[in-house]
């Protein structure tokens, strides 16, 4: 006989699971697939992203946040029972608020503003990645078109969100000096809202998934939702981390920022050059002792394999020459001493080096990331 038997179907797909087994199967999906495991989130929480990379995350995540009440409204319209509608509509209130200036979307806008965006730019959604839009829209369509059981089961990622929220808040407050508790106020409410919503949805799925096929559909729905979240981070990583290929219609660093940072000097391509500003640079002399102001630090970005200069409101990419100079800026060396050290290191004339680095130092001082 040459025909092959089909592979055996796992036992959990053939029989009706108990409520406890179904819950365990659902939670196992989160343990393996929830987006807290994505490399982008590990970088975000561990403080290894630049400010512009954090901005890209905040901007794209806004579209997801903004469409959550749209998704919930579509589901609400399909609920046949008034009691269920009363319970589910609280989700819409949580995000839209009871009045202007209230709700989760408003708090996410404050987060985006906190990292430098103008409100109008974020609201326009014109800078979000196409993959973000496709993923989020697919989720809205899924909830609108699939069975109520599948639609509700897809929301069960909220079972896992308290863990990622705790990691995110602690990690970002620790590792980014431009992030404050006020910036992350969105997550305060979600620590209580998400478990409440998850408890209701989990109970609904347990009671209404009454056949093996329906249980399988619920499991697949949660898997789909995890894929929606994961895909958004895949797109962010590809565009803004590695290989760093930003699509032509997506946000470019420097766009949509408040007036203080909406200039050429804030783009990642801006080097430590006085040409980046039209104002007259602050002159340095050989006897001056340059130093980094409080809150400004030189850091090696492991993700991009290059040094950056981090300031409270901006991030500068640095070329090798700027890095060599700034490594010697310790608040003790004069400009002439720095030039002498570099001359010995590179077997070059210190006078020529000093003449080269003076305008660079002046440009950095003009950008308020260097002082004397």
Swiss-Prot record:
Enzyme Commission number(s) from the entry: 1.3.3.11
Q: Where are the transmembrane segments?
A: none
GO BP, one example?
A: pyrroloquinoline quinone biosynthetic process
- Top-level EC class, please? oxidoreductase
Spell out the residue ranges making up region: PqqC: 1-267
In terms of Pfam families, this protein maps to:
PqqD (PF05402), TENA_THI-4 (PF03070)
Q: Which SUPFAM superfamilies match?
A: Heme oxygenase-like (SSF48613)
Q: What is the name of this protein?
A: Bifunctional coenzyme PQQ synthesis protein C/D
| Organism encoding this protein | Methylorubrum extorquens (strain ATCC 14718 / DSM 1338 / JCM 2805 / NCIMB 9133 / AM1) (Methylobacterium extorquens)
Task: Please state the gene responsible for encoding this protein.
Answer: pqqCD
């Amino acid at each position: 006989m040459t025909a092959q038997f089909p592979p055996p179907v796992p036992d959990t797909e053939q029989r009706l699971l108990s409520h406890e087994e179904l819950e365990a199967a659902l939670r196992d999906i989160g343990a393996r697939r929830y987006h807290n495991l994505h490399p982008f989130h590990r970088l975000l929480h561990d403080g290894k992203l630049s400010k512009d990379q954090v901005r890209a995350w905040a901007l794209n995540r806004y579209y997801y946040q903004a469409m959550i009440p749209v998704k919930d409204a579509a589901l609400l319209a399909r609920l046949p029972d008034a009691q269920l509608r009363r319970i589910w509509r609280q989700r819409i209130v949580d995000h839209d608020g009871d009045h202007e200036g209230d709700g989760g979307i408003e708090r996410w806008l404050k987060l985006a503003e906190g990292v430098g965006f103008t409100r109008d730019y974020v609201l326009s959604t014109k800078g979000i990645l196409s993959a973000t839009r496709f993923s989020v829209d697919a989720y809205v369509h899924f909830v609108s078109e699939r069975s109520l059981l599948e639609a509700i089961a897809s929301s069960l990622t909220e079972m896992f969100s308290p863990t990622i929220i705790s990691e995110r808040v602690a990690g970002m407050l620790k590792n980014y000096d431009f992030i404050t508790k006020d910036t992350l106020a969105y997550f305060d409410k979600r620590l209580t809202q998400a478990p409440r919503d998850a408890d209701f949805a989990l109970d609904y799925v347990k009671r209404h998934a009454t056949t093996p096929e329906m249980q399988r559909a619920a499991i697949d729905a949660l898997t789909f939702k995890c894929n929606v979240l994961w895909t958004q981070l895949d797109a962010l990583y590809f565009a803004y981390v590695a290989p760093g290929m930003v699509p032509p219609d997506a946000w470019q660093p420097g766009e949509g920022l408040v007036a203080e940072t909406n200039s050429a000097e804030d783009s990642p391509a801006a080097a430590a050059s006085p040409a980046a500003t039209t104002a007259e640079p602050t002159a340095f002399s050989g006897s001056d002792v340059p130093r980094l102001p409080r809150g400004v630090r030189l850091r090696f970005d492991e993700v991009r394999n290059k040094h950056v200069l981090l300031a409270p409101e901006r991030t500068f990419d640095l070329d090798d020459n700027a890095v060599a100079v700034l490594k010697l800026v310790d608040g003790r060396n004069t400009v002439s001493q720095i030039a002498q050290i570099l001359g010995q290191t590179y077997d070059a004339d210190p006078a020529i080096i000093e003449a080269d680095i003076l305008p660079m130092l002046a440009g950095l001082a003009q950008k308020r990331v260097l002082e004397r």
